[in-house]
Amino acid sequence: MATPRRVAVVVGSLRKDSLNRKMAKAIDAMAPPSLSLEIVEIGQLPLYNQDDDANPPDASVAFKRKIAAADAVLFVTPEYNRSVPGVLKNAIDVASRPYGKSAWDGKPAGVISVSPGAIGGFGANHHLRQSLVFLNMPVLQQPEAYVGGAGDLFDEAGAVKKPDTKKFLDTFLAAFAAWVERTAKAPA
């Protein structure tokens, strides 16, 4: 079997009991063998400041290296005020700068938005996609992943307990794996 593609999973929530972090862990356990998922933490990143471009903070350099080393990126995000959380936008900015040296460039991406509400983070999902287009990240278009009603989605072990949602996520992950194979750069 070929070496699994490395997928950086970026969770857009810092909350300790985050539904999005639970989702990231659940999909890690569900991922097909062709993908190796790793959650890349964003909570330690300083706010992006262009004045630091010549000598970026160590945390920013380490984060950017992890993104650069990945074959693809999977964003798992909540919705705050019909958009992405500030911490996620900051992480995107940190790894995209200085201009022309983006770690995101050309990396296939997927977006899963997770919410306890009925619309499953629709606003955040679409707003994030706009930024990813600018960053030259080919984003999986179908299936779109809006996971609503997430408050009672996970069992005590952290697995997805709703059969319909599990089936959908299996379909999404299979499509994402195929997308990564079609659009990622050839392994070195």
Name what the model sees in each region.
Residues 7, 20, 24, 60, ...:
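A general structural signal for well-ordered alpha-helical segments in protein cores
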Residues 2-4, 8, 49, 138-188:
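Glycine-rich phosphate/pyrophosphate-binding loop and the adjoining helix
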Residues 32-38, 138:
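A generic structural motif
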